Structure formats: structure tokens, C-alpha cells
Amino acid sequence: MVLCGFCAGFACVFGAPIAGALFGIEILAVGVILYDVLLPAFVASLTAYQVSSALGITFFYYPLHFVPAFEQGFFLRLLAGGMFFGWLAYLLIGTIQRSTALTTAIPIWRPLKGLLGGGLLVALTLVFGRDYLGLGLNLMEGCIKGDSVLPYAFLLKALFTIITLSISRSGSVITPILFIGATAGSFFGRLTGADTGTFAAIGFVSVLAGATNTPIATSILAIELFGADVAPYAAVSCVISFLMSGHRSLYASQVLTISKSRGLEPELGEEIQHINTVSRPVRFNMMTRLRSWWHGRTRL
């Protein structure tokens, strides 16, 4: 029931029933798809979406009418973008965890701590404006349209989000992550001379993929929100971001069932918040790989 509620909520908020069902399934465990919950997840997600639509709720939907043609220069930018978004997700998770631990350790009365955190947010709002409060849908839509935004907008939203979560220790993280991804994508597109709208859409889903370990759901989310033209590029970037973000997650109760790197040995089968990762040297021996491949063929 909890899973169905999660899938339904995602579908209602973002207007993405397929991605909602897959997101709820992927969020349970990293590296495993539980097929026995596919049907209830999809039923809950699709039903919630249809009910919301019947009630007249409008969703964030902006199909991209211009996507750069596939060529070598764009593909290299795409690879670099995926690494940038994964690195950003990695840093964001670590910063939220450390700031939460720090504020928890400060021996201050909790209501007073909330008052101080709220005062800090008000001060930042007076300096930088209200764009970084709330959902920020207008700014996200502007990024995807190719409008100019502050190059450090994603850092400001990250700061607002970190302060809020570290003080309150609760609150939505998905929409702020999407905001950070869209503005970071716009910044990356401008930095590399690429189309800012396209990379805003790619960053929108890629940072979420890295921060929550959900590359399949976020690839589908790109199709449902931005159209099929961006699908192959978004999928590549989401997978790279997923690999680059390491064995971390905004959802610390995710169960890790795979290692993302041959050079790391995490404790598999444990929740991410409880694992310890050990580095190991990676030796690539071509002859050993060829012998393993040949022995595998001879067994068939």
C-alpha cells in the first residue's frame, strides 16, 4: 500500500503515470526490479493520474520542439553533462547529510532552531529574491524554453534546500532536485556553447537520477514531460549520472544490491545508510577476459 501511494502521488504531482510507477519500484532497491509489484504500481499510478486529470488539474508539460542533431561534438557534451550532473548529485547528497548531522548535534531548543533557520531563509530571500522559494515552476519552464537565468541559480536553490532540510529534517526533495537539475543544465549548456533548453531538460531528469538511483524512471520521465525527441540523450545522461553519484541516495533506506564500480566493494543487501564501501585495485587483463569469454562459449 505504501508503494502504491508513492507511485500515485508521483503521478499526480508530475503528470507522469509511467515514470511514477517505475520510480516507486526503483526506489525500493538499487539494481533490482521487483516484478511482483509492477501491476499494483501501474494500476495505482494510472488511476491517480486519470482522477487528477478528470478533476481539472494541469501538469508541467513542455515538449521540446528543437533538439540538436546527433553528432560527435554534441555527444561529447552529453557525456560531460552526465558526469557533471552525477557529480552535482553526489555533492548535494553529501552536503545535506553532513549539514543535517551538524544541526542535529547543536544543542539548541528545536523551535528556536527552526526560528533561526527561517530567519536565515528570509535574509537570503531579501538578497536574492523569491525565485528560490516554493516549487519554482516558472523558472524551470523558462530554463527549458531557453530563457537566461543566473549562472549560479542552481547553487542558490541548493543552499535554500540544504538549509530547509537540515533544520526541519523533513520536506519534499524531488521538486527542489528537479529545479537544481534544470538550472544546472542551463548553466552547463551556456558554458559549453550547447542549446541551453535541451540541457536544462536533460539536467532536469539527470540530477534526479543520480540523487535517487532511478535511471529508468527518470529516462521515462523525460519522455512524458519533454517528448520522445530528447529520450536517447536523456537516457544516456541519466545512466551516467546514476553511475557517477556513487553508493549514495537521498532516500537512505534504499537497499543496495549491486556495486556501481569494479573498484568499490560495498556491503550488498544493506540499506544505503548502513553500508561501508571499501576500495580495491582494478586490474584489467585482456587475456583473462578473453579466456573467460571463450570458456563461456564452450560451455554452451
Residue ranges and their predicted role:
Residues 1-300:
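Alpha-helical transmembrane segments and immediately membrane-proximal extracytoplasmic
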